[in-house]
Design a protein with these regions (language model features):
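Transmembrane-helix bundle of Major Facilitator Superfamily
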Residues: 2-163
Length: 163
């Protein structure tokens, strides 16, 4: 007869009963959070390299190019705190997943944009999705790694992904 033990503790027979709140693949969750953080930061700066090509292909002048760059950053900064509260309400995993899907769709729209107006609109949506992804990826790490030591290590890896 076995003695019942709390979740996350070792049983008398040497087995281990996992905590149901702990995901089965914390490495996969950390990888997704790091990649999400990386693309959010990368997309804020990498568009600067493409500005001459964008101006040649789509036109729009200097003001249009400024909106291509600043629209993303503006939406990201404006919605970051609200998106963090949204992540707390709907759950980090759900918010991160939906933010990532929206980010990918907006990225595809950027690539397919026929003109500068469509590109600016897609960049605004991208910035909104990035605002959802950033705080929810950090909250996801907090949920996946409950121990202080493992959480600190995971947050360090996450921060390096955005550096």
């Amino acid at each position: 007869m076995s003695i019942p033990v709390a979740a996350g503790q070792q049983r008398a027979d040497g087995g281990y009963r996992p905590d149901p709140a702990t995901p089965r693949h914390p490495g996969a969750a950390l990888t997704a959070a790091v990649l999400g953080n990386f693309v959010v930061i990368l997309d804020a700066v990498v568009v600067n390299v493409a500005l001459p090509s964008i101006r040649h292909s789509l036109g729009g002048g200097v003001s249009g190019l400024q909106w291509v760059v600043d629209g993303y950053t503006l939406m990201f900064a404006a919605l970051l705190l609200s998106a963090g509260a949204l992540s707390d309400r709907v759950g980090a995993r759900r918010a991160f997943g939906r933010g990532m899907v929206l980010f990918v769709l907006a990225s595809a729209a950027c690539g397919l944009a026929p003109g500068i107006g469509a590109l600016v609109t897609a960049r605004l949506v991208q910035g909104s999705a990035a605002a959802v992804m950033m705080p929810s990826s950090m909250a996801l790490i907090r949920q996946v790694f409950p121990g202080a030591t493992t959480r600190a290590r995971a947050l360090a890896i996450w921060a390096m992904g955005g550096a």
